[in-house]
Amino acid sequence: TSPRLGITLVLDTRECLVTACFASLGRDPKFPRMPAADLVFGAIRRPDGSLPPKRHSYTADLAGKSIDWNYGSFNIAHVYQTERYYRVAFTPRALQRIMKNNSAMMGGERREAPKEAYEDYMDAVKIRDGLYAVSLLETNLCRRNGHGNNLFFLMNLKEMHDVGRSFGTNGEGEDENYTFGAFGAWFDAKEVMEMPGMYYIH
């Protein structure tokens, strides 16, 4: 049904803080399956009844960094182009794995990376040093194909792994929600940074 709402919480029990992601579908009548996400920063009441004065906050720490994530059956690299936009990159190894295990991701017959970079909106939140909550939207995918997701995940850059969830619709237009985890490795994305974007987001 639309609008549909998904709520995900990141609980920081060390600092008694919380970041909530409110993801939804159906806000845009032109693209009813387009995901949207709002982040809200709050606090957890301490046993003595007090609330900490500080909150989690947006960060530019990830800007210019890129990570090749291994999700088990496929690899995909997230390139954090700026503090507000990300790009997707496919390493040669990732392309081989995708074509072998999940060729539909690349349009079936494609054997090489796109000449332009897919880019879209993101928000990054610093939980503490090396630990970030990241929200990625697939709004441009939705405009092109009629469906998309909001990915929200907690990323540990000291141990190079993440855990998160997807909220949105699949290629058949059905509601899609799943959880995921991945191991990451730093990726040299200089070429991806320099590529023209499909949608020219700057």
Residue ranges of predicted features:
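N-terminal glycine/threonine-rich, aromatic-flanked beta-hairpin/loop signature
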Residues: T1, F74-V125
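A cross-kingdom feature marking solvent-exposed beta-strand/loop segments within repeated
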Residues: T1-G6, M106, P114-Y121, V125, ...
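Hydrophobic, ordered structural segments
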Residues: S2-R45, C142-G181
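A eukaryote-biased signal for long
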Residues: D68-N75, Y80-Q81, G107, G148-H202
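Surface-exposed beta-loop interaction hotspot
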Residues: T19-Y71, W186, K190-H202
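Beta-strand residues in well-ordered beta-sheet regions across diverse protein folds
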Residues: C21, N70, A89, S135, ...
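Short, hydrophobic/aromatic-rich segments at coil-to-beta transitions
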Residues: T1, D61-I67, E83-R87, R128-V134
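Short, exposed beta-strand/loop patches in secreted or surface proteins that constitute
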Residues: L9-L11, Y58-A60, I76-Q81, M122-K126, ...
